[in-house]
């Protein structure tokens, strides 16, 4: 049985080092897809690189926790900036859902302006689209646009979210992350998906070269480790041996 593996690199547009790492992992590794932060400091650079790398599918990384929003969001920003306090506001029932829906539409339009086409799919920075009150907004938007949505099945089940709300891969893994990234860890996520009988799987990753922006991230040097693993010839062979075809969200 053929299985589809989507290896999606998050944070396209975060920095030039991030962008170059994603392109390297696509051209010389197993990365097939990326998602772009349209308010990222290096988003124009990302769009330029994508034009010379048509084999890399590009989706949109919805941002509600970093930088400045594209629209006025007085209900979510502090001194005009977004931040991780969104979870506290969610717990307190103070999410400005109309502002969030409007910002999603603004970021989508910005993506199309930058890349010249619609995104292959939607996900989000720090998985904010899986916050229970935000999820139906993003899922309905994806359905309306006819594009796929990253759905973390485990979080959806725990939160009672509708897993059929939008088109998605059968499985999703965020486990290829942290100080201990390795070929073995990557392949364990595939083996677990096979054991669940899933026909398609997205594996999230963050390959990058380290630059000043990445140095300031809480998740820094492991991005280099991810890049090494994802560009391993042995890994690509092991993926094929498990019956996976490298693909994108266009394949699900």
From Swiss-Prot:
Organism of origin: Klebsiella pneumoniae (strain 342)
UniProt cross-references to Pfam families, sorted A to Z: YdjC
SUPFAM superfamilies: Glycoside hydrolase/deacetylase (SSF88713)
Principal location listed in the UniProt entry: cytoplasm
Protein name (database record): Chitooligosaccharide deacetylase
Record function comment: Involved in the degradation of chitin. ChbG is essential for growth on the acetylated chitooligosaccharides chitobiose and chitotriose but is dispensable for growth on cellobiose and chitosan dimer, the deacetylated form of chitobiose. Deacetylation of chitobiose-6-P and chitotriose-6-P is necessary for both the activation of the chb promoter by the regulatory protein ChbR and the hydrolysis of phosphorylated beta-glucosides by the phospho-beta-glucosidase ChbF.
GO molecular function annotation: chitin disaccharide deacetylase activity; deacetylase activity; metal ion binding
Pathway per the UniProt entry: Glycan degradation; chitin degradation
Alphabetical list of NCBIfam families matching this protein: PRK02134.1
């Amino acid at each position: 049985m053929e299985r589809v593996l989507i290896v999606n690199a998050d944070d396209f547009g975060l920095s030039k080092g991030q962008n170059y790492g994603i392109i390297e992992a696509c051209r010389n590794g197993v990365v097939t897809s990326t998602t772009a932060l349209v308010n990222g400091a290096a988003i124009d650079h990302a769009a330029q690189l994508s034009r010379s790398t048509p084999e890399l599918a590009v989706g949109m990384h919805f941002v509600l926790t970093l930088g400045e929003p594209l629209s006025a969001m007085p209900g979510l920003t502090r001194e005009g900036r977004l931040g991780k306090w969104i979870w506290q506001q969610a717990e307190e029932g103070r999410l400005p859902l109309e502002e969030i829906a409007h910002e999603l539409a603004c970021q989508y339009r910005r993506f199309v302006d930058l890349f010249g086409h619609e995104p292959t799919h939607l996900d989000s920075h720090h998985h904010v689209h899986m916050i229970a009150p935000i999820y139906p907004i993003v899922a309905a938007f994806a359905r309306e646009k006819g594009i796929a949505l990253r759905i973390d099945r485990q979080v959806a089940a725990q939160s009672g979210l509708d897993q059929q709300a939008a088109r998605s891969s059968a499985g999703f893994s965020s486990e290829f992350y942290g100080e201990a990234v390795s070929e073995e860890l990557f392949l364990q996520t595939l083996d677990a998906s096979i054991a669940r009988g899933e026909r398609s799987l997205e594996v999230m990753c963050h390959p990058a070269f380290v630059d000043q922006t990445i140095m300031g991230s809480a998740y820094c040097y492991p991005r280099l480790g991810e890049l090494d693993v994802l560009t391993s010839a042995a890994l690509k062979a092991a993926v094929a041996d498990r019956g996976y075809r490298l693909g994108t969200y266009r394949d699900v």
